[in-house]
């Protein structure tokens, strides 16, 4: 059991029969009345986000999530195949299970598969990934004075707003938490 006062972003808990990851939290101490913790939780089974308020000091069960390092091999229709790098076992996940992560996945990429009591909950991506630009408008000389951006389509289909100096064929470093441009690789 863990106190809600010890909430941290990324913590995994069991509440109301579900497995939830803390996305955001805020300790609130009103002038009148008892303190409480307002939290935003993501259901790891369904991907749904829910806001929940806990009384300060309330205890919740911490979910024991096991992670395995696996390599993304290929897409087989609606199924995506991953291989355990130590035992060479293969695991298939449906596109609906990893819908948000698909736009960052490249073949042979290492990811962490989240498991809870032999149930696969989803995948955990690295903080940044390198993606190649396949389509973007050419930058026009002198456009950089405004510091603007333009859309660029990557090899996975993700559209990222990039500075004008980025061209087709460039490799970008992209933040996986919000899909934003970090730098050129």
Swiss-Prot record:
GO terms, biological process: peptide biosynthetic process
Keyword Cell division annotated: no
Mutant lacking the gene: phenotype: No sporulation at 37 or 47 degrees Celsius.
Major location (coarse): cytoplasm
Claim: Protein biosynthesis is one of the keywords in the record: yes
Superkingdom in the source lineage: Bacteria
UniProt KW keywords: Cytoplasm, Elongation factor, Protein biosynthesis
An example molecular function term from Gene Ontology annotations: translation elongation factor activity
Gene Ontology cellular component terms for the protein in this record: cytoplasm
HAMAP family in UniProt: EF_P
NCBIfam families tied to this protein: efp (TIGR00038), PRK00529.1 (NF001810)
This protein's name: Elongation factor P
Lineage, top ranks: Bacteria, Bacillati, Bacillota, Bacilli, Bacillales
Gene coding for it: efp
């Amino acid at each position: 059991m863990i106190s809600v006062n010890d909430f941290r972003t990324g913590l995994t808990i069991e509440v109301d029969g579900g497995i939830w990851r803390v996305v955001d939290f805020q300790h609130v101490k009103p002038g009148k009345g008892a303190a409480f913790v307002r939290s935003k939780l993501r259901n790891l089974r369904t991907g749904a986000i829910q806001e929940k308020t806990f009384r300060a000091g309330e205890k919740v069960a911490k979910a024991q999530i096991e992670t395995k390092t696996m390599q993304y091999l290929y897409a087989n229709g609606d199924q995506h195949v991953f291989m355990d790098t130590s035992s060479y076992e293969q695991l298939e996940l449906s596109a609906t299970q990893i819908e948000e992560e698909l736009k960052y996945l490249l073949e042979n990429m290492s990811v962490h598969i989240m498991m809870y009591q032999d149930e696969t909950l989803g995948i955990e991506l690295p903080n940044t990934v390198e993606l190649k630009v396949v389509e973007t408008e050419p930058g026009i000389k002198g456009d950089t004075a405004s510091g603007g951006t333009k859309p660029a389509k990557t090899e996975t289909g993700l559209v990222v707003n990039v500075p004008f100096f980025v061209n087709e064929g460039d490799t970008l470093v992209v933040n996986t938490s919000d899909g934003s441009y970090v730098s050129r690789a």
